[in-house]
Amino acid sequence: MTQDSRFPNLFILDHPLIQHKLSHMRDRDTSTRTFRELLREITLLMGYEITRNLPMTTRRLTTPLVEIDAPVIAGKKLAIVPVLRAGIGMSDGLLELVPSARVGHIGVYRAEDHRPVEYLVRLPDLEDRVFILCDPMVATGYSAVHAVDVLKRRNVAGENIMFLALVAAPEGVQVFQDAHPDVKLYVASLDSHLNEHAYIVPGLGDAGDRLFGTKN
C-alpha cells in the first residue's frame, strides 16, 4: 500500500495480484463476463487490504480443549454500500469476504454538468457500524462526495467510512479530499487525468457499461 504526497487521505493498493487483474480490466477486448469476474476478484483482494485495521475486541468462548478470550471484530456488522449502478458489481467480492455484512444502496446518476443526481437511498441502521462505500471510478469526484454526504447527514462519522474504487483521477481525488479529508479513499490506481468528456485517462472506459454489457 502506497500514498501520494499530494493526497493524505488516498491509499493506493499496489499488490501484484490487484495490479495484474486491473490491467486485464483496462483491456478494451476483455469480455463482459471476464470484466465482471475480474471486478469481483479484485474487489475481494482490495477488501482484504482495507479491513486490516478494523477495531477488535475479545469474546469468551470454549474450544474443544479450553476456554479462551478470542479476538473478534468490535461493534456491529460491516455495512457495504455500492453507489449504483457500477458499484453493485463490487458488492459480491466484498460479501464473499464478509458474508455477514449488511448491504445498503445509494443511487446516483451524473447530470450533463457532471453533478450527481440522487434517486435512491436504502441503508441499514447506522449506529456503531463501519461503512464501505464502493464505486469503480472516482472521476470528477462529485458522486463519491455525494455518497459520503448521504452518510454524514445521518450522523455517520468520517472515521467510520471508507471509500473503495478501482481507479481515480487526480482531479476527482482533490475534490473528494477537499470535501471529506477525514474519509480514507482506497484505489488500485491513481491515473493520469480527466479528458474533455470527464473520463479517466487511461482508465478502463465506462465501468457500468462494461459490467452490464450496455451501450452509453
From Swiss-Prot:
Allosterically activated by GTP. Keywords: Allosteric enzyme, Glycosyltransferase, GTP-binding, Magnesium, Nucleotide-binding, Transferase. Binds 1 Mg(2+) ion per subunit. The magnesium is bound as Mg-PRPP. Its EC number is 2.4.2.9. It comes from the Bacteria. Its cofactor is Mg(2+). InterPro entries: PRibTrfase_dom (IPR000836), PRTase-like (IPR029057), Upp_B (IPR034332), UPRTase/APRTase (IPR050054), Ura_phspho_trans (IPR005765). It is an enzyme of class 2 (transferase). 5-phospho-alpha-D-ribose 1-diphosphate binds at R85, R110, D135, P136, M137, V138, A139, T140, G141, Y142, S143, D206. This is Uracil phosphoribosyltransferase.
